[in-house]
Amino acid sequence: MMKVLVVVALLVTLISYSSSEGIDDLEADELLSLMANEQTRKECIPKHHECTSNKHGCCRGNFFKYKCQCTTVVTQDGEQTERCFCGTPPHREAAELVVGFGKKIFG
């Protein structure tokens, strides 16, 4: 009976050790994923910078993600080109203003 208890205790110890190793591996994978997301965040395009070549790469603002806003520019030669920049659309800018004002009033 004593040998059976020792073997069971040994098996429980081995199983718990192997499962903790699996959890550590999982945490390492999550950490690598978070680091990749942080790298992507650093590569985003800030407000008022050009986003013509990457229209979905604008950074996040205080409350919303900036939108790539495009305009058509006519050069002196009469050639039309599209130029885009990251910015806050007017309706979202108004929402941020209202929320900021509400925070000042209500703390």
Swiss-Prot record:
GO terms for molecular function: toxin activity. Keywords: Disulfide bond, Knottin, Secreted, Signal, Toxin. Its main location: secreted. GO terms for cellular component: extracellular region. InterPro entries: Spider_toxin_CSTX_knottin (IPR019553), Spider_toxin_CSTX_Knottin_CS (IPR011142). It comes from the Eukaryota. Expressed by the venom gland. Disulfide bonds join C44-C59, C51-C68, C58-C86, C70-C84. Residues 21-41 form a propeptide. It is found in: Secreted. The presence of a 'disulfide through disulfide knot' structurally defines this protein as a knottin. This is U1-lycotoxin-Ls1o. It comes from Lycosa singoriensis (Wolf spider).
